[in-house]
Amino acid sequence: MYTGWLKSFKVGREFTPEERSAELHKACSIDAAPAQRLGLISINSTFVDWIDRRFLYRGMLNTSVFLIGAFGFIWLFLFLATSLPDNAPLFSLVYIFALFVTISPFAASFFLYALWLRREFFCHVYYPIRFNRKTRKIYVFREKRDGGLLIVPWDKVFFHIGRGTDMKFLRDIRGEILDGEIVKDTFALGHCAERDEPVKEMWEFIRRYMEEGPEAVAEHPLDKYVELSVAPTWKNCLISAVGFTNATTPFKRVLLFPFIGTFTVVRWLVFKSCKQPVFPPEVEAECQVEPNDPHIWPIPNSIGEFVTTVPGLMAYAMRKAQGIKTPPDVPGDLASQFKDWGKK
């Protein structure tokens, strides 16, 4: 989960047979229905932007622990700094020991920042991976320290189901740039999962878009909306924290409130210190969108907004989750709401 984020993917290595056997094919459909799985940021006739793997984990458990630890060490440093003995000789053992004890917490807080927090704060809110079906290119937005912007042809990337380095039960979509059997670069996209099916569903969405067009990714008119919101708002941070803690019932939410509250605040602080990702002008020039593009899907202000506000959409989503097909001739006023939102 943290490879490619806290530590870089290994490059210059030999591509393994296990990775090759887990290939996600571009030309043929797989046994999975296309699904966003909260991975789609935006879509139109020219490109889709997909979320990076780390997004849902930003500001959560590890970051909260490290941040609270850093603040605790700073507080301890200030407390000890005001407690240095005034009457001890400057180079006495007592003074040196007191100085060492005082500086240690400050050094520890700096270590926590260098180890983890610098990867969270003062970076970017998210790191989109853009798939342009007209230029047949992929644009991977990355920090300069991680190699900077990667632009690579769609047909030159080997995609497969990646596995976690430490948490081997986790899967994700992994893109490999190969030179023969040697890995030259690697990137991951979409949220990780504990099963292959969610990963395959995200891949089928991307594959259909690039190979068949935007009309192929939605099997029903009521599927044509974006589920995810990347806006760094309190509400989105709270929704993400509830999802991260798996607080699916009111009882769980009350029980886990200290964690939910902490994660919400820390995630909000992380995002407020970060800036929005902006692709270079030359990339945007290749990704022009027509003003009246019929395949621009509406984007919610908060995660899951449309399901809770559009009449009938919750029932449709529940039927879909149960595998129940819904006829495409839905009431006109219900289907048209997405069409109207897309023009706003």
Regions found by a protein language model. Give the residues of each.
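Phosphoinositide-dependent membrane-docking surfaces
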Residues: 137-138, 147-166
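Juxtamembrane amphipathic/hinge helix adjacent to a transmembrane helix
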Residues: 41-45, 213-245
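Short, non-transmembrane cytosolic segments of multipass membrane proteins
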Residues: 1-39
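Alpha-helical transmembrane spans
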Residues: 49-125, 233-344
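Short, hydrophobic/proline-enriched secondary-structure or compact coil segments at domain edges
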Residues: 36-57, 173
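A membrane-cytosol interface segment of integral membrane proteins
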Residues: 158, 166-227
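Membrane-cytosol interface motif
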Residues: 128-143
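Short, mixed charged/polar active-site loops
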Residues: 128, 146-152, 182-186
